[in-house]
Amino acid sequence: MAQPILGHGSLQPASAAGLASLELDSSLDQYVQIRIFKIIVIGDSNVGKTCLTFRFCGGTFPDKTEATIGVDFREKTVEIEGEKIKVQVWDTAGQERFRKSMVEHYYRNVHAVVFVYDVTKMTSFTNLKMWIQECNGHAVPPLVPKVLVGNKCDLREQIQVPSNLALKFADAHNMLLFETSAKDPKESQNVESIFMCLACRLKAQKSLLYRDAERQQGKVQKLEFPQEANSKTSCPC
């Protein structure tokens, strides 16, 4: 079973402006507030973006999928250290003709990014540079957490992208690398780890922002992520 591969890149706290946009869903009642973390999944068509979101949000692999047109999103409520958090996963189209009208919308107020490639298609890996450029070109703060995911690892005989090459790329772009399969039920825990890793980091960053804001009497400053913060969360990465 393929395991997540952790690169030397670290997930750093998002910018103060980005963190300030983390939303609260208070529609249930005045006593219950659920934070919403918006995570977008981007990459070439047919790399398995939709299947990854189905596996995480519903625990299933769809029998049949069609090319995503524009953007779609799925949600899953998770509990981290006693707090319920809604993880909103935005599944984006990989084809240019479906992206033009929606691209600004799904990059708006993003909290974390998942870049996906197909380990059996080298072109999907080489195109990652294009996706990163698009992300940067839409003013996504450079400190927004990002991870790299190599999907379809169940097709072991067809792998074209070696792990060491992917790890080198992830390190160069300050990302963690996960290799997994949305199709293989045995890999479901690894798919879960991708999104839970980001959710844990975002939760920790937001908590730090609140404490800093209180100390500064409402004045928000950029935060340095403390080394011990990782041990205080149930973060899988």
From Swiss-Prot:
S-geranylgeranyl cysteine-type lipidated residues: 235, 237
Entry membrane topology: Lipid-anchor
GO cellular component, one term: endosome
Residues annotated for GTP binding in this entry: 46-51, 65, 68, 94, 151-152, 154, 182-183
Presence of the UniProt keyword Hydrolase in the record: yes
Modified residues (Cysteine methyl ester): 237
Cofactor(s) listed in the protein's UniProt record: Mg(2+)
Motif Switch 2 mapped to chain: 92-111
Chief location category: membrane
Localisation: Cell membrane
Binding site for Mg(2+): 50, 68, 91
Keywords per UniProt: Cell membrane, GTP-binding, Hydrolase, Lipoprotein, Magnesium, Membrane, Metal-binding, Methylation, Nucleotide-binding, Prenylation
EC number: 3.6.5.2
GO biological process per UniProt: antigen processing and presentation; autophagosome assembly; Rab protein signal transduction
Residues spanned by motif Switch 1: 59-71
Superkingdom of source: Eukaryota
Oligomeric form and interacting partners: Interacts with ATG16L1; the interaction is important for autophagosome formation.
NCBIfam families assigned to the protein according to its UniProt record, in alphabetical order: small_GTP
Biological function: The small GTPases Rab are key regulators of intracellular membrane trafficking, from the formation of transport vesicles to their fusion with membranes. Rabs cycle between an inactive GDP-bound form and an active GTP-bound form that is able to recruit to membranes different sets of downstream effectors directly responsible for vesicle formation, movement, tethering and fusion. Modulates autophagosome formation through interaction with ATG16L1.
Protein family membership: Belongs to the small GTPase superfamily. Rab family.
Domain-level remarks: Switch 1, switch 2 and the interswitch regions are characteristic of Rab GTPases and mediate the interactions with Rab downstream effectors. The switch regions undergo conformational changes upon nucleotide binding which drive interaction with specific sets of effector proteins, with most effectors only binding to GTP-bound Rab.
Protein name, entry field: Ras-related protein Rab-33A
Organism encoding this protein: Homo sapiens
